[in-house]
């Protein structure tokens, strides 16, 4: 064998520290050294091995068995599932509540807008800002005189001043023969009229029809 091989394979060796197993009886052992055997000593490595074994033993004692670990994992999984279920139900309830509130708000807004649309259309149909239609006015007046004059006492026919000449010319004889008193009011619409008597009042103006329309719509709501 060459010197090179010897140098390469050479490893430095250190003697191990040796300790007495029962260190309390050191004095006794010193007086009886000839009685000591190999079993009375231990090295540092053996001490480490024993310590590691003790640690592993303690860890095994603390570590749960497979069945216990399975039960713990199963219980933990159930709890997490229940938490997710509760969270899901809460979110679902919130979503349904918000949806119900949104639908209710939508219905309310839709109803309000629909009502406004109806009122606007009705106002165009029966609005005040229209031209006088002699046929409409004459029809309304004749209807009231023919149907209601028998039941009315001290009756007054109230019309717009602009219709004075027209009505006096057309129904003059009927008005005076039935003892009607013609009265004029600028606040009455051009195609409307009112009847005032001791028995009661009859309002055949656009304003009255408009109020009645609003009342009927409100009752439907």
UniProtKB/Swiss-Prot annotation:
GO cellular component terms attached to this protein's record: bacterial-type flagellum; cytosol
Entry keyword annotation includes Aminoacyl-tRNA synthetase: no
Gene Ontology biological process terms in this record: bacterial-type flagellum organization; bacterial-type flagellum-dependent cell motility; protein transport
Places the protein is found: Cytoplasm
Keyword match Coiled coil: no
InterPro entries referenced in this protein's UniProt entry, alphabetically: Flag_FliH, Flagellar_FliH/T3SS_HrpE, T3SS_Stator/FliH
Molecular-function GO term, any one: cytoskeletal motor activity
Name recorded for this polypeptide: Flagellar assembly protein FliH
Organism name: Buchnera aphidicola subsp. Schizaphis graminum (strain Sg)
């Amino acid at each position: 064998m060459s010197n090179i091989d010897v140098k390469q394979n050479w490893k430095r060796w250190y003697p191990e520290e040796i300790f007495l197993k029962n260190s309390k009886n050191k004095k006794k052992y010193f007086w009886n050294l000839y009685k000591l055997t190999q079993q009375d000593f231990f090295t540092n490595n053996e001490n480490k091995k024993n310590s590691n074994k003790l640690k592993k033993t303690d860890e095994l004692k603390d570590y749960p068995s497979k069945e216990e670990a399975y039960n713990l994992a199963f219980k933990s999984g159930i709890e997490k599932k229940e938490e997710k279920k509760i969270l899901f139900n809460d979110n679902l309830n919130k979503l349904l509540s918000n949806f119900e509130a949104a639908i209710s708000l939508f219905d309310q807004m839709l109803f309000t807008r629909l009502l406004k649309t109806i009122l606007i259309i009705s106002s165009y149909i029966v609005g005040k800002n229209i031209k006088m239609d002699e046929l409409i006015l004459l029809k309304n007046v004749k209807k009231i005189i023919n149907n209601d004059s028998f039941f009315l006492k001290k009756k007054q026919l109230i019309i717009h001043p602009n219709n004075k000449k027209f009505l006096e010319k057309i129904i003059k004889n009927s008005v005076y023969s039935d003892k009607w008193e013609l009265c004029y009011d600028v606040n009455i619409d051009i195609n409307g009229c009112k009847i005032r008597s001791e028995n009661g009042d009859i309002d055949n103006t656009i304003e009255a029809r408009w109020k009645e329309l609003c009342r009927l719509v409100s009752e439907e709501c």
